[in-house]
Structures are given as C-alpha cells and as structure tokens.
Design a protein with these regions (language model features):
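A short acidic, Gly/Pro-enriched loop at the edge of an enzyme's catalytic core
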Residues: 222-230
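Glycine-rich beta-strand-centered segment in the early N-terminal region that forms part
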Residues: 25-39, 49-98, 132, 137-139
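Glycine-rich phosphate-binding loop and adjacent beta-alpha segment
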Residues: 237-303, 334-335
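C-terminal hydrophobic helical "lid"/dimerization subdomain
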Residues: 3, 287-335
Length: 335
C-alpha cells in the first residue's frame, strides 16, 4: 500500500513526509482493517511534524479517517466487511484507570492516539480496535465526513465545555476547520446566540459571515457588546490574552488546542482573570463525544467546507494549512 511516512521532525515547508510502499497491515484480535477513502489534515499533524507534540517515529500521520471495513481480526463482531466507518484521534484507552472509570478516557495516561502513537490515515489502509471505530452517517460523502472526526468532534467538545446558554454572545477566535463546523452547530442549537468571529483572513471572514456570524473582525477590532463565552481555535499564544481581555465578568474561555505554536504572554490578574473569568482547555476526545456528535451533525445537517488533495500531495496540504490559506478543512483522498 501507499503511505506517507514521517521519519524526522522539522518545518513542514521542508517536505517531511515521504511517500513509500508498505505491506498492508494485518488486524490483530478485536481489530478491523479499513481501506481508507479520505483522511482529514489537522493542525495536530503540524504540531507532530514540527516537534511540539513529538510522535513515535517513524509514523504514518492522520486521525480523521473515513473508509470501509476490508477485513476483521479474530473476535471482531461490531462491524461487517464493507461497512463505512470512521477512525478518530483516540485509538485506545485502558478502561481501568481513574480517568477512564470516571468517563474521561481522553485523560487516560496510557491512551494511544491515532497518527501519533499508532499509524494513522495518510495511507491506503489503517487498522483500529473495533471499539474505537464509528459508523458514518449516510448523508456525508467520504471527504465531507473526514473533518467531522476531529475538527467536528473536538469543536463539539469545546462548545460543551464553554457552557454556552442560548442568547449569550459567543466569540470564535480563528476560523478554520473546527470553527466553521462549530458555528453551524451554534446556529442550529442556540438560535438566539450572537456569534462574533476574529480571524486575520478576509476570505475566512467572508465564510464566517456566509455561515451566520453576526460580526467579523481581526484581533485588533472591538465587537459590539459584551462577550460571554469564547473558544480559541488558533495556534497563537497571544490570542488567550486577547480573548480574556474581552470577556464579560463571569465569562469563560475554552482553548481548543493541544499545543500553541508560540508562548502565552504574561497575564495581568485584574485585566484578564478578575471578576470570576474562567479558562478551560480541551484535551483530546472521548468515544462518547464522537458517538454524540456524528448523529447530531447529520441531523442539523452540518455542511463541511472541504478542499481535497491527493495522498501524494500531503506535504503541500500541510504547508497551505500552516499558512492559513485553506477555507474549511483540507482532506486527503485516496482515489
């Protein structure tokens, strides 16, 4: 099979992925082999390749995988050959630690992550424990479904963590793959909420307005009225300070990032945290997040904005993603 392999860390501009031929993996007991149709390209891959979230090496990246079951490992009974499934960031959790027993498998210290600890979806085939695969709603094409598995699921988790009430003002910082899905959830499920979007790109602002943003601007602009909840999707450390400075008393900021590309600047307690302002981070996802979000996405229905690339062009997709030159979500397709 063809696969893009990361062997050394460094800037994505250097074309760190190498296209190779590899044997098709064999599913172990309880696993399924998936013929990959599409795999989303995520900011987490930038963090892995550039060393901010160092993966096992060599590794096949990619954790937003859509494909069809090709083969069942012994004892695997949840799916049938030919079923369409998705594979997300969480690949396995122990099920016995304090976090897992509390329903927080995303915090399991022994968890394995797709495309970081085990080979992912920048390849023609991938294997996964059947308990960590998900049925894909029929209404989505393969490339549309791929970003739902991370950008959508982690965005859904961030929105839940924001504790948004209908009618409050929600600020979204950055408007890429995750934010463009979250805004559609908010417009559907929180119809009285006012949405303001901060992004540097005029093309991204235009997309935000098309999807229902009430106001758009850059980090230097001031939106009308107070901001009660905010979600930071950016890789920029200073966005945390900017967002906290705009929060109303009692407001909450959710930082939807595994790593920041640059440091968070020093905060001033009175300006940024006083008046019971809160900061929460998102940390990975659970199976429950995906199992709740995918049917919700079909019901709304979410319309993912995607730009497709061939598997051979994965390095180009990563560079464009880093440069902020992709509207919506980049997706690799295998055909």
């Amino acid at each position: 099979m063809k696969a893009q392999v990361l062997s050394t860390l460094g800037p994505v501009e250097d074309g760190r992925l190498t296209l190779v031929d590899r044997p098709v993996p064999v599913p172990a007991a309880g696993e399924i082999l998936v013929r990959v149709a599409a795999c989303g390209v995520c900011h987490t891959e930038l963090d892995e390749i550039e060393g901010r979230l160092a993966p096992r090496l060599p590794i096949v990246p990619g954790h937003q995988i859509v494909g069809r079951v090709e083969r069942l490992g012994s004892g695997a009974t949840r799916f049938q050959t030919g079923d369409r499934v998705g594979i997300a960031w969480i690949n396995w959790a122990c099920g016995t630690c304090d976090a897992c027993r509390a329903g927080a498998e995303n915090l399991c210290p022994a968890a394995r992550w797709t495309g970081k600890d085990v080979d992912g979806g920048y390849a023609e085939y991938a294997v996964v424990p059947e308990a960590f695969a998900y049925p894909i709603p029929a209404r989505f094409a393969d490339a549309e479904a791929a970003p739902l598995l991370c950008a959508g699921v982690i965005g859904y988790r961030a929105l839940r963590l924001s504790n948004l009430s209908d009618g409050q003002t929600l600020a979204l910082y950055g408007f890429g793959a995750s934010a463009h899905i979250v805004i559609q959830v908010v417009r559907s499920r929180y119809p009285r909420t006012r949405i303001v979007v901060f992004t540097r790109s005029e093309e991204h602002r235009e997309l935000a307005r098309r999807l229902g943003a009430h106001w758009t601007g850059s980090a230097a602009d001031a939106p009308p009225g107070p901001v009660h909840r905010a979600i930071d999707f950016t890789p920029i450390g200073s966005t945390i300070r900017d967002a906290l400075s705009r929060l109303a008393p009692g407001g909450r900021l959710v930082v939807n990032a595994i790593r920041k590309r640059d440091p968070v600047p020093e905060l001033d307690y009175a300006a940024h945290l006083w008046h019971e302002k809160e900061v929460k981070s998102t940390a990975n996802v659970t199976r429950q997040d995906a199992e709740e979000f995918l049917p919700l996405a079909a019901d709304i229905p979410i319309v993912p904005e995607v730009r497709t690339f061939r598997l051979e062009d994965a390095n180009d997709a990563l560079v464009l993603l880093k440069q902020g030159r992709i509207q919506g979500a980049p997706v690799l397709t295998m055909t």
